[in-house]
Amino acid sequence: MSHAVANKTETEAAPNSSLKQSAAPQPANSHDAKLLNGTLARTNGLTHAASVATSSSGSYGSSSAAGSNAGSGGPTSSASLSIAAGVASSTALPLPPSSNGLQMPYERFRADDTSYVPIAQFYAGRSVFITGGTGFMGKVLVEKLLRSCPEIRNIYLLIRPKRGQEVSARLTELLNAPLFESLRQEKPKELSKVIPISGDITSEELGISEKDQNLLCRNVSVVFHSAATVKFDEKLKLSVTINMLGTKRLVELCHRMLSLDALIHVSTAYCNCDRTDVSEVIYAPPYNPDDIISLINWLPEDILDQLTPRLIGKRPNTYTFTKALAEHMLLKEAGNLPVAIVRPSIVTASLNEPFAGWVDNFNGPTGLVSALAKGMFRTMMCEKNYVADMVPVDIVINLMIAAAWRTATRKSNNLLIYNCCTGQRNPIIWSEFVKHAMTSVRKHPLEGCLWYPTGDLRMNRPMNTLNCIAKHFLPAYILDGVARIMGKKPFVVNVQNKIAKAVECLEYFATRQWRFKDDNVHALLHTLSPKDREIFVFDVRHINWDKYVERYVLGFREFLFKQRPESLPASRKRMLRLYYLHQLTKLVAVLLTWRFLMSRSKRLNDLWSSFLENALRMARLIPFL
């Protein structure tokens, strides 16, 4: 099968060719020169950086300049200097001679196929290792495996000790969450299959003890890597450490596993957000991942923070930047491991499993819809006719489980990528999503709403800024002022600042549109038996967005705000009062504006008097008046 490598003009260099760089790169401008000179003067560990960069000479994406620098005894590699100075070559790094960008064969399930192994049967007797198991997606993955693959042997969770809490206590807290309620009642013994592994994704060897490493290497045959920092404004150093180095360290562990059948890496559809059309391929990286890792090891963090905007280029944040490089790290380091990458778009509340509307965080649209429900969010920069590519978390998890099954059973080292998105097969635009959300938060209001939920999407920045001041911050300062007078603690301004920060992170994705191709997802769907399609649902064409958004609102009402359905009647009465107050406020605002204009313009006053006089005359012509 031929390699469907995207952007041929960027990647048609021979696989073993090197990135072209100037022998003596110069800073792009005087400001960068000062930063770089200051760095070289203040940093003592540059010799180590040179050895790291030089050791990669001749490997995938390595720099010929780095190799020549080794003999000169220079303090750092030419590649690292180029990156720091912001003058790295525009020539894209070649992709390694791997099966990047393959399209999955389109094979339909046949009822007479005796070789077909059901997904649950595939997981029977197997042990699974999960990173990020205490996160939003990880929790749903653990619950789904326990519920739908009852003969699974063990699930090992990488858990970090946190705030003095041991991993066993954190696991107990996890399994006592509402998400596992049905399992606790119906299959309590299944929970004993979950085994904590103490570790830290930011540490060498993942912070796992030698004993636990040996345990994993002997027993694990499927690995799900979902650990990541999803903070869009994360520092580059920490983002690289978690998203890139964490991936590299996990792959090193996987190479030691005696019976590994599948490694599923969770990326993001937006790792290639610098292009409009995104296929199920790995695109040429902006930099050699090893150079970026070398850079964070020797560059002072304050200088690194200043250079971050130049490094990430057209990408909006460190999250998408490091996720893109992590895919290349995986492609380079995996070798002959059976690997697949799942790229979800914006992950939101569950569609059906384990119950509709489950969500445990305020990230992304959840936080904004929650603020809308509270009456604290009324305007946003957004292209209302663009696709809001959101995907329910259980859809992503079912795809991950099926992708691991397919990776293991097809017995091929070719890396496949699955874009898990809704925009191509069942799109919803932002205006429709907001309309459904507005209807739902009014129908199922939160307790303690501050105002009647309403708002608009805009693409006029000055108008949006004026509305933010008038509708967000001005009322917030007034309410906090009243709170201080009454001797209460002010909080509204602080909440509005958090909302503004969340909006700023989401704005990039709400004002742009992408076309994510999902042919591999569609092909995988058709290889499943009808029964497996019912158990592991990831066909996004069946999502009813109106019903989904309503369940979404009911879900965060119950699971985030801890408000029971019994409180809805009282909340609806309060919502009705807020509606009348909202209408009265608008009427008063119109009258005050009109009164102000009348007092400032004699001509307008005369026109108004003339209008009233003519209206009165016409009224007298009506017989019954």
Curated annotation (Swiss-Prot):
Annotated segments matching region Disordered: 1-39, 56-75
EC category name: oxidoreductase
Cellular component per GO, a single term: peroxisomal membrane
Keyword match Oxidoreductase: yes
All ranges on the Peroxisomal side of the membrane: 598-625
InterPro entries, A to Z: FAR, FAR_C, Far_NAD-bd, NAD(P)-bd_dom_sf
Biological processes, Gene Ontology terms: ether lipid biosynthetic process; long-chain fatty-acyl-CoA metabolic process; wax biosynthetic process
Main location: membrane
Record field: transmembrane: 578-597
Membrane topology reported for the UniProt record: Single-pass membrane protein
EC number: 1.2.1.84
Keyword line: Lipid biosynthesis, Lipid metabolism, Membrane, NADP, Oxidoreductase, Peroxisome, Transmembrane, Transmembrane helix
Keyword S-adenosyl-L-methionine: no
Cytoplasmic side: 1-577
Catalytic reaction list: a long-chain fatty acyl-CoA + 2 NADPH + 2 H(+) = a long-chain primary fatty alcohol + 2 NADP(+) + CoA
Polar residues bias (residue ranges): 14-29
Protein location: Peroxisome membrane
GO molecular function list: alcohol-forming long-chain fatty acyl-CoA reductase activity; alcohol-forming very long-chain fatty acyl-CoA reductase activity
Family matches, as PANTHER family: FATTY ACYL-COA REDUCTASE CG5065-RELATED, MALE STERILITY PROTEIN 2-RELATED
Role summary: Catalyzes the reduction of C16 or C18 fatty acyl-CoA to fatty alcohols.
Protein family according to the UniProt entry: Belongs to the fatty acyl-CoA reductase family.
Full protein name: Putative fatty acyl-CoA reductase CG5065
Provenance organism: Drosophila melanogaster (Fruit fly)
